[in-house]
C-alpha cells in the first residue's frame, strides 16, 4: 500500500489512486505550489474531510467544488469555514434553508465538524486552491481521488448524496441510484438559491432517506460556540 495519507480506511479505498503516476504528478505539483504561492487549506488540512469521516462511517456526502480561496476560510471540509470567519453567502443560505426545513437555529460560526463527526462527508471535488483563484487547481489530478471516493461509496451503498448545482450534479453518472439516494437542487449561492435551493428541504429528505436505509438520522443542530479542543 502507498504511504498512509489519511490514517483510516480511506487509505485502502484510495490506495490505487495514491499509488498512481497521476497522483505522483499531483504531489510534485503541490509541493511546488505550496513552496511558491499561498494555497488553501494549509497542507495539514487537505484531507480533513476524509480524516473526520471514515469510509465505513460515511452516510451522507455534501459535494462542493473547491475550497474557499481567501485567508482564514478553508479548513478541508466543503462549505465549512474556520470559527471567527464571517459566514460566506452560500453558507448563510444553507443555514436559512436548514431553519426553514428542520427548524435548526442558525449559529454565528460556519464550522461544520459536528456534521462530519456524524458521518457527513463534506467533500470538495478539488481539495486545494490558490489564493484568490477559484478553480485554480481544477484538472490537476484531485478529481481522480474524489471520483474514486464517490464511486467506492456508491458501490458500498446506502449513502445519501446531496448535490447542489450543475458541477456537483455532473457526478451523478458515478452514483448507482438503485443503492443510494440523490438529493439535487440549484446551488445555495446568492446567484442561484432562489432558483430551486430554497424550499428544496434537503436536510429532512436526507434524514428520511437515512431512516429508510436503517441508519440513524443526522442531528443538524450545530453548537453555539466552538472550543479549541473541537478543532480538527
Curated annotation (Swiss-Prot):
One of the Pfam families matching this protein, by short name: UDG
The keyword Metal-binding belongs to this UniProt entry's keyword annotation: no
Function: Excises uracil residues from the DNA which can arise as a result of misincorporation of dUMP residues by DNA polymerase or due to deamination of cytosine.
Keyword Hydrolase: yes
Record-listed E.C. numbers: 3.2.2.27
Gene Ontology biological-process annotations: base-excision repair, AP site formation via deaminated base removal
Protein name: Uracil-DNA glycosylase
Cellular compartment(s): Cytoplasm
GO CC entries: cytoplasm
PANTHER family per the UniProt record, alphabetical: URACIL-DNA GLYCOSYLASE (PTHR11264:SF0)
Top enzyme category: hydrolase
InterPro entries, A to Z: UDG_fam1, Ura-DNA_Glyclase_AS, Uracil-DNA_glycosylase-like, Uracil-DNA_glycosylase-like_sf
Domain of life: Bacteria
Family designation: Belongs to the uracil-DNA glycosylase (UDG) superfamily. UNG family.
